[in-house]
Regions:
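C-terminal, flexible cofactor-proximal segment of oxidoreductases
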Residues: 1-3, 10, 339, 346-433, ...
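Beta1-alpha1 glycine-rich phosphate/pyrophosphate-binding loop at the start
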Residues: 2-91, 175-176, 185-225
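FAD-binding core/adjacent interface of flavoenzyme oxidoreductases
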Residues: 2-12, 83-176, 272
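FAD-site-proximal beta/loop scaffold in flavoenzymes
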Residues: 4, 135-166, 257, 265-340
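Short glycine-rich anion-binding loops that position phosphate/pyrophosphate groups of nucleotides
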Residues: 23, 122-125, 188, 277-279
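A Rossmann-like FAD-binding core segment of flavoenzymes
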Residues: 82-101, 105, 192-303, 307-309, ...
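Rossmann-like dinucleotide-binding core of oxidoreductases
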Residues: 169-225, 229-235, 243-245, 333-372
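Cyclic nucleotide-binding regulatory domains
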Residues: 443, 448-505, 513-519
Length: 531
């Protein structure tokens, strides 16, 4: 155990920015530039990670087209003259004008006092609305997520190359993406490129086709840029071999299957989820303190991005509903990167003006359009009211986002990696794996036999919800409900003695690794608890 850490004295700043995404980083950058060197004592940026992720290129990391360091930029180098604090926001106390943050394992919670508060915390990922998705779906929101997806795909290829059972191989070579927005479509396109390019290096996969399946709940992909371009993106992806399922909602996910529209299912061991955005709990708590009604999970603001009745509270980005004059029509700004970075810059300028006794200006932005890649040398675009697709759209996507990528060194690295990709195959080396969860959760659908008699025992289970039955011919069934442990009582010589089947939709915790070795040594967590 580490030595006890004494409580830290509170920190104090004139301006405290919460969130290190586009809005928060560009706000800090603007303030640091306008206030100069003195800003380091007056302005602080609190972020969970010390680097800003350039999300438009994140899918290319998952597809092994770019290295992870190409899409992150250190906040301390980006936000000059600003104090960057790596910590997680625990609580915002608006009445006390303070924020409680968690700095890490060896520090106590830190209190930070402020005069002006800028909330740019964005949204969170919540997959719990689909049974099993939290346990078996991989989100796509961070560099860690992208690397995890890349590792999973390459691991599936390696396992499929070794498998002799054709049905097992088919499940291993089926990659399912849920959600047909920007993240889902761009990630699906990158995975398709990676898998198609990699198969030639796996000698045993020539006769088993890989499947990349995209499931979307709406009638068109990329509804943000209109049905015409969404339909074009669909045609391009289908022409390249992707399966696209529209007007379909996912109902359940397990380690070997995904179910949609209640009765349809796909055998797969790889599920990538681009759905599940949910309001940030800290933002919702702040709204409750202020007595204001969130707008679809976002803080409503004035055009200046101040919260009505609270001139020292500002909000921007995905967690803020910012009014926007779209050529004479008032709308709420969409939660996209191009709006977030401009909102952040405007807040920085507004706060600098208010500190000088001047008035804050409203947020204005002339919408330029949107672009999305759908694979190698293919993209769709809506720019200045014009819609087009193909190579020109792809070239424009790369040119525009390369220009927006922070840091000259990163621009040069991305140019090199893109050039390298045109000439050589994508990298199939497995990145260093993250430390696994010692007790991960797993979900089983009703009727699923997830262990068969004679299988090697690689883990024990504790049932969290549902009902699991252990069966063997000529023997009485055993039933395991919530709180029950399925352990060595069901094994013999390292093999399972019975089939394990989920009678109803069930969740369980897995014990493996050192915990499994301890249990195999004879330690029982609780009596079998079978009934």
């Amino acid at each position: 155990m580490p030595d006890a850490v004494e409580a830290n004295p509170p920190l104090r700043y004139k301006v405290l920015i919460l969130g290190g995404g586009f809005a928060g980083a560009y706000c800090a950058k603007a303030l640091g530039k306008l206030l100069g060197p003195k800003a380091v004592d007056e302005v602080a940026l609190v972020a969970e990670r010390n680097a800003m992720v350039f999300h438009p290129m994140l899918a290319e990391v998952a597809g092994s087209a770019l290295a992870p360091q190409d899409v992150v930029h250190p906040l301390r180098q980006f936000c000059r003259n600003v104090d960057v604090l790596q910590a997680k926001v625990q609580h915002i106390d608006w009445q006390g004008k303070k924020v409680i943050v968690d700095g890490g394992r060896f520090t106590r919670n830190q209190t930070i006092h402020f005069e002006h508060l800028v909330v740019t915390l964005g949204s969170i990922t919540d997959l719990s609305r689909v049974p099993g998705m939290t346990e078996h779906g991989m989100p796509m929101k961070s560099v860690t997520d992208a690397l995890r997806i890349r590792s999973a795909i390459i691991n599936r290829l390696e396992e499929a190359n070794l498998a002799s059972d054709e049905e097992v191989r088919k499940r291993l070579l089926t990659f399912t993406i849920v959600g047909g927005g920007y993240t889902g479509v761009e990630t699906a396109g990158q995975i398709l490129d990676l898998v198609k390019g990699a198969k030639e290096f796996y000698a045993n996969l020539n006769n088993t086709p890989a499947r990349v399946v995209l499931i979307h709940s709406r009638a068109h992909l990329l509804e943000e840029i209109g049905p015409e371009l969404g339909d074009h993106a669909q045609r391009v992806l289908e022409r390249r071999g992707m399966e696209i399922i529209l007007n379909s909602r996912v109902n359940e996910a397990t380690s070997g299957r995904i179910t949609y529209n209640q009765t349809n299912s796909i055998g797969t061991h790889t599920i990538i989820s681009s759905i599940g955005n949910a309001p940030n709990p800290a933002v919702m708590d702040l709204c409750r303190q202020l007595g204001i009604e969130p707008e679809k999970g976002r803080i409503p603001t004035l055009p200046t991005m101040q919260v009505a009745g609270h001139p020292t509270l500002w909000a921007a980005g995905d967690c803020a509903a910012v009014p926007w004059d779209d050529e004479g029509e008032m709308k709420t700004s969409p939660p996209t990167a191009q709006f977030a970075l401009r909102q952040g810059t405007r807040i920085g300028r507004n706060i600098a003006a208010v500190l000088k006794g001047e008035k804050a200006a409203p947020f204005t932005y002339r919408y330029m359009g949107q672009l999305a890649t759908v694979g190698t040398r293919e993209a769709v675009a809506e720019v200045m009211g014009y819609r087009f697709s193909g190579f020109i759209a792809w070239w424009m996507w790369r040119t525009i986002y390369l220009a927006k990528l922070p840091g000259t060194a990163r621009k040069l690295r991305v140019i090199f990696d893109w050039t390298f990709e045109l000439l050589f195959p994508r990298d199939l080396a497995l990145p260093v794996a993250a430390t696994p969860d010692p007790m991960p959760s797993v979900h089983f659908e009703a009727g699923e036999t997830f262990i068969e008699k004679g299988d090697v025992c690689r883990a024990y289970l504790m049932v969290r919800s549902g009902l699991i039955t252990a069966t063997a011919p000529g023997e009485e069934d055993r039933h395991y409900g919530p709180g029950s442990i399925i352990d060595q009582a069901e094994t013999e010589n390292g093999l399972w003695k019975r089939n394990l089947t989920a009678v109803e939709s069930s969740d369980a915790i897995i014990f493996r690794g050192r915990m499994l070795e301890l249990l195999k040594g004879g330690v029982r967590l609780v009596p079998g608890a079978a009934r």
